[in-house]
């Protein structure tokens, strides 16, 4: 039985050696995987930096475009305000024209008889002026004949009746 103890020691040493070899193989495999992960992370880090740069550039462009659009909107707002002011002015003008037209129509309808009388009197005044002109012209001619106002009125009446 003395021999069992050294054999057990040898078996234990061989088992320990196999265990160590197994652990070394696993550690080598893990190291390869970690190296692969490290390379992948380096690539991802480079891509993230590129994406970050592009995103920053895009944000700057968007900010510039936003400022440009805001400036144009501000300028356009002044144009819209001016057009609104013109529209308000035109609307006020239309209201004023409507009020004046209504006032004129109302005054004409109220003063229709007076206007008719004015027209009649103006016709009478024009007839008198024509008669005076005719009388003046006849006095200046060689066939001077003295007429009275009654003769002129009679002549005017006869000329209208004959027409």
UniProtKB/Swiss-Prot annotation:
<dbReference type="Pfam" id="PF06103">
    <property type="entry name" value="DUF948"/>
</dbReference>
<comment type="similarity">
    <text>Belongs to the UPF0478 family.</text>
</comment>
<keyword id="KW-1133">Transmembrane helix</keyword>
<dbReference type="GO" id="GO:0005886">
    <property type="term" value="C:plasma membrane"/>
</dbReference>
<keyword id="KW-1003">Cell membrane</keyword>
<dbReference type="InterPro" id="IPR009293">
    <property type="entry name" value="UPF0478"/>
</dbReference>
<feature type="transmembrane region" description="Helical">
    <location>
        <begin position="7"/>
        <end position="27"/>
    </location>
</feature>
<keyword id="KW-0812">Transmembrane</keyword>
<protein>
    <recommendedName>
        <fullName>UPF0478 protein SERP1299</fullName>
    </recommendedName>
</protein>
<keyword id="KW-0472">Membrane</keyword>
């Amino acid at each position: 039985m003395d021999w069992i103890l050294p054999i057990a020691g040898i078996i234990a040493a061989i088992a320990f050696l196999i265990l160590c070899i197994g652990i070394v193989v696993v550690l080598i495999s893990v190291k390869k995987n970690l190296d692969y992960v490290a390379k992948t992370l380096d690539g991802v880090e480079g891509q993230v930096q590129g994406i970050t740069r592009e995103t920053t550039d895009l944000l700057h462009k968007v900010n510039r475009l936003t400022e440009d659009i805001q400036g144009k909107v501000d300028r356009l707002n002044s144009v819209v305000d001016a057009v609104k002011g013109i529209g308000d002015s035109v609307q006020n003008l239309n209201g004023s024209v409507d009020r004046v037209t209504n006032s004129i129509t109302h005054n004409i309808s109220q003063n229709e008889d007076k206007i008719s009388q004015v027209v009649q009197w103006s016709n009478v005044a024009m007839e008198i002026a024509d008669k005076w002109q005719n009388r003046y012209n006849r006095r200046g001619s060689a066939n001077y004949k003295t007429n009275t106002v009654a003769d002129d009125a009679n002549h005017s009446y006869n000329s209208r009746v004959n027409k």
